[in-house]
Amino acid sequence: MNFLIFIAVASSLALGALCKKEGYPYDGNNCRYICFRNQYCDDLCKKLKGESGYCYGWNQSCYCYGLPDTEKTKPDKRCHSKG
């Protein structure tokens, strides 16, 4: 019986670790976080419960790794209107 409980807990922990995503997080205005420094993005991503992040210089937007599935990300454009 204890073995079955152990397997159930281990499985749920493993699934939780696998359910992470990456991408450009965005704010309440549907805009990506503009950046110039990697440290700013790394701190932002960790605040959003991600593992790490960096400033993608080509489009000057924060890119995060290991975000929870509940965090919204935009794969393309920098800013979107709410309408």
Curated annotation (Swiss-Prot):
An annotated Gene Ontology molecular function: sodium channel inhibitor activity
Keywords linked to the UniProt accession: Disulfide bond, Ion channel impairing toxin, Neurotoxin, Secreted, Signal, Toxin, Voltage-gated sodium channel impairing toxin
Keyword Disulfide bond: yes
Cleavable signal peptide: 1-19
Keyword Disulfide bond on entry: yes
Annotated InterPro entries: LCN-type_CS_alpha_beta_dom, Scorpion_toxin-like, Scorpion_toxin-like_sf, Scorpion_toxinL, Scorpion_toxinL/defensin
A GO cellular-component term linked to this record: extracellular region
Described purpose of this protein according to its UniProt entry: Binds voltage-independently at site-3 of voltage-gated sodium channels (Nav) and inhibits the inactivation of the activated channels, thereby blocking neuronal transmission.
Protein name: Neurotoxin LmNaTx10
